């Protein structure tokens, strides 16, 4: 039995779950998410908990069990509390701002980089150098934050670039060079 898959998912007070075959919909104060589950996985609602089980003991069913339980738990978490990723810009003159549904980054290129954000994602800029990506879909929040970071990942010599708040950047020593005469 999957150690993660066998744990029940607690449903908060204001969260409603609808299960129709392999389609599961979760509705809460922050919004609504739905996902289609593989045919090897079944979800049952018991009072204020959800149980994820597998249909048989085949290897693919065992592989998907813990994954599907975590995906459903993230849906419940997202519609009740939401998710957030914070990024910081490190570098002289690096700035971020929002304009409509676009994030505009000035990160040392000859032009500002515009990143449209998908529906269901909110992006806020704190100060000029902290970007907050939030939403109810954990996967979408993480992918959007990764796309922003990929514009200018931190470089190992000076540490300039876009990084997650709290991320440790491995630094390298520069060239030592020979002594000048």
From Swiss-Prot:
This protein binds to the 23S rRNA, and is important in its secondary structure. It is located near the subunit interface in the base of the L7/L12 stalk, and near the tRNA binding site of the peptidyltransferase center. This is Large ribosomal subunit protein uL6. InterPro entries: Ribosomal_uL6-like, Ribosomal_uL6-like_a/b-dom_sf, Ribosomal_uL6_a/b-dom, Ribosomal_uL6_bac-type, Ribosomal_uL6_CS. GO terms for biological process: cytoplasmic translation. Part of the 50S ribosomal subunit. GO terms for molecular function: rRNA binding; structural constituent of ribosome. Belongs to the universal ribosomal protein uL6 family. It comes from Synechococcus sp. (strain JA-3-3Ab).
